[in-house]
Amino acid sequence: MVHKALHGSAWRELDYLFVENVGNLVCPAVYDLGQSVNVVALSVTEGEDKPLKYPVMFRKADLVLLTKIDLLPHLDLDLAALEDGLARVMPVPRVIRLSARSGDGVASWLAWLEERRSVLAAQARAGRAGHGHPHEHV
């Protein structure tokens, strides 16, 4: 839906387009928007049960941003259980711990975005756009 709307539009000049879900971890996991990557933002305040409670969302994720990590000292969160849950549902769990308050992880998040953009641009130049129809994606 989003992908189709972007074809032939002025949006082609964008390097990144973020589409945020409706605010929960269950609804948007089953919809294909034509996206190139899936990133799940999981706040440490949500608890360690979320990967096992919403496995589809995490299984489809290319990356999990574990957010609000500056709050960890104030929470009763079992980080090992959370990481175990991610390992059980994700083919290759990739996690970046992030704090907007302290800035921890922001450089890693930006580097990951740039690396993914570069890979996708190279695939597009080689004609391997990756989602079933031929054209350039940069």
Q: Which sequence ranges carry the predicted segments?
A:
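Inter-motif core of Ras-like GTPase G domains
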Residues: 9-10, 21, 28-46, 53-66
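A generic local structural motif
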Residues: 2-6, 25-28, 50-53, 83-84
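Histidine-centered metal-binding segments
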Residues: 125-138
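Canonical P-loop GTPase G-domain recognition
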Residues: 70-127
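Conserved nucleotide-binding/hydrolysis micro-motifs of P-loop NTPases
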Residues: 23-25, 44-49, 69-72, 101-104
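Conserved nucleotide-sensing/catalytic segment adjacent to the nucleotide-binding pocket
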Residues: 1-19
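Generic recognition of short, well-ordered alpha-helical segments
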Residues: 1, 33, 52, 56, ...
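A generic structural signal for alpha->beta connector loops
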Residues: 13-15, 35, 92
